[in-house]
């Protein structure tokens, strides 16, 4: 490890733009997760780039369910709200239904970030079983399926507090059935 720079005895110098600011882990999608050293310049540049395409306002309320050690959550779920003056509520453990549902009701987030697995679990547990109860010809008829998806997505929006305007999904590919549900249901999601 390098010795920190100093402005004199007992006074460290402020960090430079290329000094390491954080050790962030990859998701391990193509192998084991790896630690990536990010500089102050990396973090600020990423946050500023996100601000250009992702509108976060001081009135926004984010609910964080992903680990801050993941670059997606660190940048979009922590740094961007910090720079924008928005508030962030952190879940105090894994996003199990018993932990997540009361917090969603209390916080009523406007923005939430997720990995595909979370929304896919919700889709498989809450939507697929109800869709399966429809007769086969109705289930396969696109207008019926779209209407069903809209109704189910409306209920899901209420479950998420009724104010959700952006549900960001990243870190891995989203399954096509879950994405069709979100798209048909006009759920306010974005990928990336």
For the regions a language model picked out, list residue spans one by one:
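Conserved AMP-binding A3 loop
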Residues: 21-47
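Conserved AMP-binding/adenylation subdomain of ANL enzymes
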Residues: 44-61, 68-153, 163, 184-185
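Short aromatic/basic micro-patch
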Residues: 14, 37, 113
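Conserved G/P- and acidic residue-centered "switch" motifs that form tight phosphate/ATP-binding loops
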Residues: 28-29, 85, 171
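Conserved pre-ATP/AMP-binding loop-to-beta segment of ANL
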Residues: 6-25, 32, 55-61
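Conserved AMP-binding/adenylate-forming
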Residues: 112, 148-192
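Conserved S/T- and glycine-rich ATP-binding loop of Class I adenylate-forming
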Residues: 20, 26-29, 62, 67, ...
């Amino acid at each position: 490890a390098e010795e920190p720079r100093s402005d004199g005895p007992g006074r460290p110098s402020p960090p430079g733009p290329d000094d390491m600011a954080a050790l962030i882990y990859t998701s391990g999608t193509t192998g084991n997760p790896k630690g990536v050293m990010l500089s102050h310049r990396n973090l600020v540049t990423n946050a500023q780039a996100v601000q250009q395409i992702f509108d976060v306002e001081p009135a926004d309320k984010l609910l964080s369910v992903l680990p801050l050690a993941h670059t997606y959550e660190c940048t979009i779920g922590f740094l961007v709200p910090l720079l924008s003056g928005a508030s962030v509520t952190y879940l105090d453990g894994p996003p199990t239904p018993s932990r997540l549902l009361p917090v969603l009701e209390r916080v009523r987030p406007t923005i939430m970030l997720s990995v595909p697995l979370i929304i896919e679990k919700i889709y498989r547990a809450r939507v697929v079983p109800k869709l399966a109860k429809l007769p086969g010809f109705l289930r396969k008829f696109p207008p019926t399926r779209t209407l069903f998806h809209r109704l189910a997505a409306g209920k899901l929006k209420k479950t998420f507090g009724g104010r959700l305007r952006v549900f960001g999904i990243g870190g891995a590919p989203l399954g096509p059935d879950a994405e069709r549900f979100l798209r048909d249901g006009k759920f306010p999601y974005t990928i990336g």
